[in-house]
Amino acid sequence: TATMSAATQPETLTSDARYVCLDLLGAGAYGHVYRGMDRSTGTAVAIKIVELDMSTEELNAVQKEIHILSQVQCPFVTRMYDSFVVGMQLWIVMELCVGGSCADHARQGRLNEAHIAVILRDVLRALVYLHAEDMVHRDIKAANVLLYMDQHGTGIRVADFGVAGRLQQAHAKCERAFVGTPYWMSPEVIKQSSYNTKADIWSTGIMAIELAEGEPPYADLHPMKVLHLIPRNPPPQLSPTYSSAFRDFVAQCLTRDPAKRPTAAALLKHKFIRHAGSAVSILTPLAQQYKPLKHSASSQYAAAQTTDPPPLWEFASLRR
């Protein structure tokens, strides 16, 4: 567990406060996240705390996250329970996922194709829901896919809507915002051409490679170099050591032309996904053996860094 600094110490609450912060889990693009407790029920929760001395752009991004999460009703997306201001801090109370992120497990080399197929299936189910609601996540990556365990079983939740956006009819279902994390960005996002939900599909393909190999393509390069290479180079491919079905799934996700890139609903019918097994039987052992790494930067909602310097490729989500 990371050590709390004075800057990240939660505001002191009265003795009758409903929620209490316990240990620091990680730091995301807009705030710190703690393991906490709902004292009215004894339920463990995640509490994201955002300092309010921030720019209007940053505060608007956080408010967008709250607004979007409050509307989402999907079993494959993290649930938000409450939000309020404490002193000069905004507290966002949400579901605690105790099984670690898929980035944690991928970096430890624990994932085989059976694990990956189940994870991708549930990510696609989340995207089907979000895209039907005219939402684009725009930062799909393994650090934002969390494993959970509860009395009903084990599964995954797609997290971190800090940069997600609702598409508006007035914008012809297209946006020109430059957001996301460089290694997972689609060519059209980097070029800042109009794009839609298909940007999430490209990121899903990159994440599939990350799950298999422990890191995304170009992980050894500086993020600015990656932003130059992705639009110019051929799409990344999996090595022949993986099954043909898995390689074809990745290739379809990484179709360069977004108009020809399949939808999340279409990808759910892909052979690699159709043959995925039971989430409970396949993911439960993973979640049970999870132990946070000392230098792990991806606990709950950790997309940027912890108190330890992150590996180069864990580049903070760009905001502009």
Give residue ranges: language-model regions.
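Protein kinase catalytic-loop region centered on the HRD/HxD motif
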Residues: R125-M135
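Conserved short submotifs of the Hanks-type protein kinase catalytic core
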Residues: G87-S101, H105
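Conserved N-lobe ATP-binding subsite of Hanks-type protein kinase domains
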Residues: H32
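Activation-segment/catalytic-loop signature of the eukaryotic protein kinase fold
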Residues: S83
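C-terminal regulatory tails of eukaryotic serine/threonine kinases
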Residues: P258-A259, A265-R320
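Conserved N-lobe beta3->alphaC-helix segment of eukaryotic protein kinase catalytic domains
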Residues: A44, I49-Q73
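Activation segment signature within eukaryotic-like protein kinase domains
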Residues: I119-L120
